[in-house]
UniProtKB/Swiss-Prot annotation:
One of its GO terms (biological process) is translation. One of its GO terms (molecular function) is ATP binding. Disulfide bonds: none annotated. Allows the formation of correctly charged Asn-tRNA(Asn) or Gln-tRNA(Gln) through the transamidation of misacylated Asp-tRNA(Asn) or Glu-tRNA(Gln) in organisms which lack either or both of asparaginyl-tRNA or glutaminyl-tRNA synthetases. The reaction takes place in the presence of glutamine and ATP through an activated phospho-Asp-tRNA(Asn) or phospho-Glu-tRNA(Gln). This is Aspartyl/glutamyl-tRNA(Asn/Gln) amidotransferase subunit B. Pfam families: GatB_N, GatB_Yqey. The gene is gatB. The keyword Ligase applies. Belongs to the GatB/GatE family. GatB subfamily. SMART domains: GatB_Yqey. Heterotrimer of A, B and C subunits. HAMAP family: GatB. Its EC number is 6.3.5.-.
Amino acid sequence: MQWETVIGLEIHAQLATQSKIFSGSSTAFGAAPNTQASLVDLAMPGTLPVLNEEAVRMACLFGLAIDARIDRQNVFARKNYFYPDLPKGYQTSQMDHPIVGKGHLDITLEDGTTKRIGITRAHLEEDAGKSLHEDFQGMSGIDLNRAGTPLLEIVSEPDIRSAKEAVAYVKAIHALVRYLGICDGNMAEGSLRCDCNVSVRPKGQAEFGTRAEIKNVNSFRFIEKAINHEIQRQIELIEDGGKVVQETRLYDPNKDETRSMRGKEEANDYRYFPCPDLLPVVIEPEYLAKLREQLPELPVQKRERFESQYGLSAYDASVLSASREMADYFEKVQGICGDAKLAANWVMVELGSLLNKDGLEIEQSPVSAEQLGGMILRIKDNTISGKIAKMVFEAMANGEGSADQIIEAKGLKQVTDSGAIEKMLDEVLAANAEQVEQYRAADEAKRGKMFGFFVGQAMKASKGKANPQQVNELLKKKLEA
């Protein structure tokens, strides 16, 4: 039997506000446990929440970016459940009247095609605290620094049909919230977490299968692995005569498997009701109109512009527009050197390799956009060859200065004097007289292979400084004379 996968994702994006959603406590990551929890966060009697306006602004920006309906009036609700790191015994969230309604996001698939994923809603809520198990023998500790941190929960429609599509969607959300400046997207620190709802059904069947939810997956790689494992688990279970149980599961990356955590709750289990401590939030059309003017160029728009304005391939444009910082870096380099394709190649290949090797983000690059743009100019004006440029790039990465300073200090300037190159070629050919005779006696096919040998010898003799184009032209004339 052929099976079809149905996936819906719930992404929790931690909003980049300075303070919490209902208190003035800091949201900074990494503080000592329980040093950033106010009386409101601790749910002390007599305290009342005050809504953070910046969180509302960020949620509205997101809604505008996904072309969603933003309700004029939205309401906070209490989601009731007991957990040790939830001091109030309920989480302040939104249920019937979320701040962001239906919208959509277009994702790019591996084959270059585009698919539209519906977004059901996005609502504001507060995060819970954190249970600590490793540092206490036979006990658990509670850190409430995270309690009250503002989250935007983004709920997709069940439009996703594979693990790779799911990763593409999460990457698109990740890029979007970073472009908007509403979330830093740091998955390792929990700033972006994903719950994956996965079910399978016979191909062609309209009715959904029973879904399982995989909680709190925090990397693109783990999202793909967790979903693929869950798909296989459900198919094998059904084909063996069993039934999928609606439940919440956890992904164990060490064993590459999901395991049952608890039975899946429905909305009724949480006994939602309007929060009596918070008035409805009214968002006027004029407020949204002003926010719309603040929207930056979004990832899809930037990718399309890179293709049309700079003539980049869809793949290159996609990579370079993946983050706002990467796109800005590329455009600075291009603005200096005036060659988009050379700039794209150096940013994606050489710089990308350097950053990956050292585990750095583009904003931590040891080579500035100004340095890289200046170096590419020296390739274009034939001051250095592409091979020498790699040496210059490495020196810039080691902090040895600008391209011009390094070229001067190391004597790397390309030899373009025809007379000097001819003299060097005569010496190379004289030292390889036997190979010259073999070349002249060979047919065209063999000559092509042998020509590379002479070019290599010439570049070796010039220590890579001779202009490759001139070497090729002059060498061909001499060998065929």
